[in-house]
């Protein structure tokens, strides 16, 4: 057998299939922004999903990949198994080969067998390999038995074992409906020194027989009623775990013993000064998933993907704490990770500083919570009798001490202690469901559009073109005709309208037919078709009608200008802040642009101004903006920037160059020269997540309008100051200082007023049932001063009941305040007094037993209010005496 490094095995796999005519396709991002059904990329086929569904076409019919994957959160979640088994990971690489109609079962099996057993390839012993097939898939069974010549005793049929027809470990399906088919799994026998029985038997969960490759044969389309319709072009999707095959070829039984993990575990041991194998494995696994997730744009947060990332980071930190690590250590593992991952970590290397900063910040924020929470959990477990931690205590640890429930559960599991999930389920519902809710992404391909629909886009060169209506959709239903005032989606065979993509909004305009005019308010992509969304303003529109499609030129020009400005912005940011700046999102609107990018701190005002200066310099240079079609390799050699999570599958990519300043891969529309932009102005810079900043900017006429508004504002303020604007800032500062002086004098006057009012009120105190009582009126006193008066009198007298009625002499409204010292609240309460007064005189209010308020009381006779107050107090005291 081969004994290559993991990096060499990865390349060997890709080289093998490349020699067999497969296109090597780069790994997609761990976050698929084009597939709302996925929390994370969890298999090699994810980036080809639309191809299998018939919504996308590639220029190649077979491909091979080494796909980075995450399984932590959502349907596929291996997180809690990491550290307790030899083969589960949160992050792993899936090697795969794919056929989109180029070949099927026989060729796929022959290719797999050649790679696994060929002398110049993996050279595995044939007698160590077992295979499984779906129970009724005789075709696959016979290929293994008659063409590959595997002994029949090592070919295992697996039937339906999940409670319904075609629900089996050996029958793959994308969903309840859609593409599906049988699969054949290949197992490696590690030898009888390990526990485990052959696949298909009760003992298959041991470590002796390990699945190393799954060959999926997508040959049916499952209907709503469960019937299977054969596909015209069956496909192949295979997946081999790189870490698993590396363990086989490096002659080890655990994935954590392969070269990559051995080096990472050593690095973890170095930074934690520990040798605890289980925790070292957990941390080594988690640094891979966390670093690559941050690199792909995920940041720790309280929901969605960010919550899952936070979960993984904190689990790693907790294991570090168990090893004795008290200082931040996790971020220090990014550098050794980059070293061991080789070319797979090229992007991560470019963003190393940012990734380290995000991980370090999260670790430092969590450290205090962890130490306090773990101490309290230890106290609880020490006193625990039995083997179950009750749910109320688990919730208290979270609510009071901030210890996440998943850490409580993890720690308890290590001690064979169960957590009463039913006990804390209701109280923890929101927190516990965050990751789960994040994974409930809607599964909605636009199935109403035929997968054969296709629109040719002419809008790079034309804003007006002729076309034919090929489809109409009204209320999600295909129709033959639409009429006046109906809102619909129109599909044309040719269109100049740009469909929303790449952050650029869709075009608007008009589609004119002989008998109708359709107002387009937006344009979106539906697979290979472009849908024109809008309303029929006149007449009718039918399938087959010849039409003239005309884009709103003013709006398109504004959008194009802002798109070009976005490219200038990214290059300026990378020039000023560093190459770690990577686009994390964008919105190109006709009135403004928005650009999200990776950067670990807020930009200084001087930096924002410098970015504006750089961009406006390029605008004044009036650089030519041009596009070229070339291979991806050629574009990369030119230094073209690509969108982080976008896959460029065409043999030719579109490269947009702005003079010598910017080169990017882009499919959007753009200005002809930078001078068309006119002016660039940043309206805001803010943080939207840890390590992610957002800039919003305006250009051209909108920027000029903003400058005019600011200029007018300065002019108006200057006129108020009777100033020419030359020293306006000094004038404003002088005014601020003057205001502060006046406020200080005002506070002094208020203090004097309070003292005077207290002196007057103190002479009005009477006794009622042996208790000091003050009932009095005030005029035009602010509520805050009333509260201050009450507090001061309570402090001076020690035991007193105070009710003050303040009348506003302008509107006649009366505000009341009642105060009772602590020693009297068992006899009379401020809130009871106010409640009774509101019932009598109206108004609104409330409070506590020691202080309460009422406002908006309208009365013509304040003396009546005061008289009634005295009666209330007397009654309350009498009632309290009778009760005692």
From Swiss-Prot:
NCBIfam families: alaS. It comes from the Bacteria. Consists of three domains; the N-terminal catalytic domain, the editing domain and the C-terminal C-Ala domain. The editing domain removes incorrectly charged amino acids, while the C-Ala domain, along with tRNA(Ala), serves as a bridge to cooperatively bring together the editing and aminoacylation centers thus stimulating deacylation of misacylated tRNAs. The gene is alaS. CDD domains: AlaRS_core. Catalyzes the attachment of alanine to tRNA(Ala) in a two-step reaction: alanine is first activated by ATP to form Ala-AMP and then transferred to the acceptor end of tRNA(Ala). Also edits incorrectly charged Ser-tRNA(Ala) and Gly-tRNA(Ala) via its editing domain. It catalyses: tRNA(Ala) + L-alanine + ATP = L-alanyl-tRNA(Ala) + AMP + diphosphate. It comes from Baumannia cicadellinicola subsp. Homalodisca coagulata. Zn(2+) binds at residues 563, 567, 666, 670. This is Alanine--tRNA ligase. SUPFAM superfamilies: Class II aaRS and biotin synthetases (SSF55681), Putative anticodon-binding domain of alanyl-tRNA synthetase (AlaRS) (SSF101353), ThrRS/AlaRS common domain (SSF55186), Translation proteins (SSF50447). Belongs to the class-II aminoacyl-tRNA synthetase family. GO terms for biological process: alanyl-tRNA aminoacylation; negative regulation of DNA-templated transcription. InterPro entries: aa-tRNA-synth_II/BPL/LPL, Ala-tRNA-lgiase_IIc, Ala-tRNA-ligase_IIc_anticod-bd, Ala-tRNA-synth_IIc_core, Ala-tRNA-synth_IIc_N, Ala-tRNA_ligase, Ala_tRNA_ligase_euk/bac, DHHA1_dom. Binds 1 zinc ion per subunit.
């Amino acid at each position: 057998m081969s004994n290559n490094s993991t990096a060499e095995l990865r390349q060997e796999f890709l080289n093998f299939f490349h020699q067999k005519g497969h296109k090597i396709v780069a790994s997609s991002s761990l976050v698929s922004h084009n597939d709302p059904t996925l929390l994370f990329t969890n298999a090699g086929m994810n980036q080809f999903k639309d191809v299998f569904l018939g919504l996308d076409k590639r220029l190649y019919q077979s491909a091979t990949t080494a796909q980075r994957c995450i399984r932590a959160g959502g349907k596929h979640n291996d997180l809690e198994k990491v550290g307790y088994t030899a083969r589960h990971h949160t992050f792993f690489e899936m090697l795969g080969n794919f056929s989109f109609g180029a070949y099927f079962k026989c060729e796929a099996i022959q290719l797999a067998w050649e790679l696994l057993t060929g002398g110049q390839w993996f050279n595995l012993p044939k007698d160590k390999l077992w295979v499984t097939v779906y129970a009724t898939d005789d075709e696959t069974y016979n290929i293994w038995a008659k063409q590959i010549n595997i002994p029949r005793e090592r070919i295992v049929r697996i039937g339906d074992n999940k409670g319904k027809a075609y629900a089996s470990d050996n029958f793959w399906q994308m969903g309840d409906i859609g593409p599906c088919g049988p699969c054949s799994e290949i197992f490696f026998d590690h030898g009888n020194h390990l526990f485990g029985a052959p696949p298909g038997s009760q003992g298959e969960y041991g470590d002796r027989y390990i699945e190393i490759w799954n060959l999926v044969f997508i040959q049916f389309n499952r209907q709503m009623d469960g019937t299977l319709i054969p596909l015209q072009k069956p496909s192949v999707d295979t997946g081999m775990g790189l870490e698993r095959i590396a363990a086989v070829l490096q002659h080890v039984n655990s994935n954590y013993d392969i070269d990559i993990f051995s080096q990472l575990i050593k690095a973890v041991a170095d930074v934690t000064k520990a040798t605890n194998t289980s925790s070292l494995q957990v941390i080594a696994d988690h640094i891979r998933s966390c670093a690559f997730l941050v690199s792909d744009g995920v940041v720790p947060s309280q929901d969605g993907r960010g919550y899952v990332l936070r979960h993984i980071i904190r689990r790693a930190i907790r294991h570090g704490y168990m090893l004795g690590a008290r200082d931040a250590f996790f971020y220090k593992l990014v550098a050794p990770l980059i070293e061991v991952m080789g070319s797979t970590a090229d992007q991560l290397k470019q963003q190393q500083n940012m990734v380290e900063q995000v991980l370090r910040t999260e670790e430092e924020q969590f450290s205090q919570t962890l130490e306090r929470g773990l101490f309290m959990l230890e106290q609880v477990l020490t006193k625990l009798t039995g083997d179950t931690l009750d749910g109320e205590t688990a919730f208290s640890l979270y609510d009071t001490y901030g210890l996440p429930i998943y850490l409580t559960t993890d720690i308890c599991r290590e001690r064979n202690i169960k957590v009463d999930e039913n006990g804390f389920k209701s109280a923890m519902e929101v927190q516990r469901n965050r990751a789960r809710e994040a994974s409930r992404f809607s599964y909605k391909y636009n199935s109403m559009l035929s997968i054969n629909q296709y629109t040719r886009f002419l809008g790079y060169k034309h804003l007006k073109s002729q076309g034919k209506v090929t489809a109409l959709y009204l209320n999600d239903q295909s129709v033959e005709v639409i009429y006046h005032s109906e809102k619909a989606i129109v599909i044309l065979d040719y269109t100049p309208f740009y469909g929303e993509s790449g952050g650029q909004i869709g075009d608007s305009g008009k589609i004119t037919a002989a008998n109708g005019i359709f107002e387009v308010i937006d344009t979106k992509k539906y697979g290979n078709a472009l849908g024109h969304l809008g309303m029929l303003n006149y007449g009718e529109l039918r399938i087959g009608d010849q039409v003239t499609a005309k884009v709103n030129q003013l709006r398109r020009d504004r959008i194009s200008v802002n798109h070009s400005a976005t490219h200038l912005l990214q290059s300026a940011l990378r020039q000023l802040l560093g190459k770690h700046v990577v686009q994390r999102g964008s919105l190109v609107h006709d009135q403004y642009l928005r650009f999200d990018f990776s950067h670990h701190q807020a930009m200084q005002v001087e930096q924002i101004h410098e970015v504006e200066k750089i961009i406006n310099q390029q605008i004044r240079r009036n650089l030519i903006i041009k596009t070229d079609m070339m291979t991806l390799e050629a574009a990369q050699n030119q230094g073209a920037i690509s969108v982080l999570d976008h896959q460029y599958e065409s043999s030719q990519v579109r490269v947009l160059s702005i003079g010598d300043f910017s080169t990017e891969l882009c499919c959007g529309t753009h200005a002809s020269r930078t001078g068309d932009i006119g002016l660039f102005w940043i309206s805001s810079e803010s943080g939207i997540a840890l390590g992610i900043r957002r800039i919003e900017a305006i250009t051209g006429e909108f920027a000029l309008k903003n400058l005019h508004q600011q200029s007018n504002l300065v002019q108006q303020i200057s006129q108020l100051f009777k100033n020419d604007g030359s020293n306006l800032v000094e004038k404003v500062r002088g005014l601020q200082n003057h205001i502060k002086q006046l406020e200080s004098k005002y506070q002094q006057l208020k203090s004097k007023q309070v003292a005077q009012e207290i002196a007057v009120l103190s002479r009005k105190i009477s006794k009622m049932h042996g208790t000091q009582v003050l009932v009095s009126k005030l005029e035009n006193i602010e509520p805050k001063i009333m509260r201050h008066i009450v507090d001061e009198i309570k402090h001076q007298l020690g035991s007193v009941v105070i009710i003050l009625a303040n009348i506003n002499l302008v509107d006649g409204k009366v505000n009341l305040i009642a105060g009772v010292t602590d020693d009297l609240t068992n006899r009379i309460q401020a809130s009871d007094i106010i409640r009774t007064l509101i019932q009598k005189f109206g108004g609104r209010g409330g409070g506590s037993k020691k202080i309460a308020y009422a406002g908006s009381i309208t009365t013509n006779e304040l003396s009546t209010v005061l008289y009634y107050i005295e009666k209330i107090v007397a009654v309350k005291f009498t009632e309290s005496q009778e009760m005692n």
